[in-house]
Amino acid sequence: MTASGTRRARLAEVVGVIGRATDVGLGLPIEHAIRTCLLCVEVGRRIGLDDADLADLYYLALLRMLGCTAGSAQYADLFGDEVRFARDTAHLDYGDGQVFGAWVMGHFAQDQPPATREAMIDHLFTYTPERRRESLSGHCEVAQLFAAQLGVGPAVIDGLGYVFERYDGMGAPSGVPGPRQPVIVRVLTLCNELEVHHRLGGPLAADTVARERAGGAFDPELVAAFCADRDAILAVADGPALWDDLLATEPGPPRGLNEPELFRAPG
């Protein structure tokens, strides 16, 4: 409660709930965004980010998929069950066309009759790189608009425009190479994938993917920092009370939202 009697909510709580909601929308475990956030802060601390940058990284990690509804209709048309598709492909390197194509031919729409499946695959491959760039550009713009309503800092809003980029410049929507991306984005790109592979295959799987994709999707220096103390870093995402860990990990003093800001928050 403020001096004027206006109630205040903690920004970390609101953004944490949004992160959980986007996890559900992507068919991921409900604490994917939280675990990713915890990994981001741990890696960020180890590379020497200050509290201001760590706070921006913290909120960026939780809001990464804030614009996920922007392309829902298009994705449903392309993928059928777009939530299932997002869940089943979360482990793939989207920058490796051969790996992605092999997954589609081996796994996509396997529950459909052969003729239907063939038609669905043909339709899926109309999703050209140009269409993907357009779609992800819309996602980023929606995320940035929503984030501005929450009152997060300009570095978070700016960072949301890069969350689908890659270190090698082969990402989307703009193909910005790693050295020109904010460091908080590069940390998030790595930690988002570390969470998926650690959850699916354990520390060795996370380590293997990090090394294989260094210089491609990931910043090699960040990969080296992770691999130097892999188990200790991954341990922060394995606690029994992840929500409490999330709130305790918020860098700097807790930030609040007053009631009018809360009612403007995306929901």
Model regions: which residues?
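Histidine- and acidic-residue-rich, metal-dependent catalytic cores
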Residues: 2-267
